[in-house]
Amino acid sequence: MEQRLEIEQFICRSDNYGVLIHDPESALTATIDAPDAYAIEAALERRGWTLDFIFTTHHHLDHVEGNEPLKEKFGVSIIGPEAEKAKIPGIDRTVKGGDEFTFGLFKVKVISTPGHTAGGISYYLPDAKVVFTGDTLFALGCGRLFEGTPATMFHSLEKLVALPGDTALYCGHEYTQNNARFALTIDPDNSALKERAKEIARLRAHERMTLPSTIALEMATNPFLRWHDRTIRARLGLQDAPDEAVFAEIRKRKDMF
């Protein structure tokens, strides 16, 4: 039987996603990253929850700036990537790819997803069918390669697309509309992408959030995951290139978009 995980999602810091997860059985609550302590406190108050954990995906300031004020107020335990422990304020416990731990009734699997940063991780809760990818995989996009190579990011994305297609995807930023504009330059004849772009435009016109997505939806519409697609390969002039090279070219084009 699928266990119920309550999720509260909101936008803060202009385009960061704040995400709270709550296990109603144990009454435990965690925030995925801590972009804005004030916004997180307001969301907790709306739901009547108290904060127990911060699950850090990577060390960038817009994901950890709330760590210390939230720790001071709630006494939270901060979990984050072993490879970035020196850069994560207030960290209490380090984890790495392949590790597992429990959050209430839920098993949490840690996936190593470097590329955006050297030690970034994602948190996968199989019983809730949800993955939190930070700035590795976005709706219709992927993170910039600040501390990694295209090969590094490619292999991280390979791990994420191996998850079940009905896995819900939550990421770190509301970049989806701009990502859709770029995606249409790479994959303009993709009918699923065109329909999705229209829906995204409608949502954003009303200042509504475009997440969560799913792994299956991203595989059908996100050009950064469609390295196998023959039409995309032909458009890029990379019909016989390795998958990794196709991804690298798409990332290069996005950097210049």
Curated annotation (Swiss-Prot):
Required cofactor(s): Zn(2+)
Cofactor note: Binds 2 Zn(2+) ions per subunit.
Family annotation (Pfam families): HAGH_C, Lactamase_B
InterPro entries cross-referenced by the UniProt entry: Clx_II_MBL, Glyoxalase_II_hydrolase, HAGH_C, Hydroxyacylglutathione_Hdrlase, Metallo-B-lactamas, RibonucZ/Hydroxyglut_hydro
GO molecular function: hydroxyacylglutathione hydrolase activity; metal ion binding
Positions that bind Zn(2+) 1: H58, H60, H116, D135
EC number: 3.1.2.6
Catalysed reactions listed for this entry: an S-(2-hydroxyacyl)glutathione + H2O = a 2-hydroxy carboxylate + glutathione + H(+)
UniProt: Zn(2+) 2 binding residues: D62, H63, D135, H173
Family assignment from sequence similarity: Belongs to the metallo-beta-lactamase superfamily. Glyoxalase II family.
One BP annotation, GO: methylglyoxal catabolic process to D-lactate via S-lactoyl-glutathione
Keyword tRNA processing: no
Record-linked SMART domains: Lactamase_B
Subunit comment: Monomer.
Top enzyme category: hydrolase
Pathway it works in: Secondary metabolite metabolism; methylglyoxal degradation; (R)-lactate from methylglyoxal: step 2/2
Keywords assigned by UniProt, alphabetized: Hydrolase, Metal-binding, Zinc
TM region(s), chain numbering: none
UniProt KW Zinc keyword: yes
Name by which UniProt lists this protein: Hydroxyacylglutathione hydrolase
Summary of the function given for this chain in its UniProt record: Thiolesterase that catalyzes the hydrolysis of S-D-lactoyl-glutathione to form glutathione and D-lactic acid.
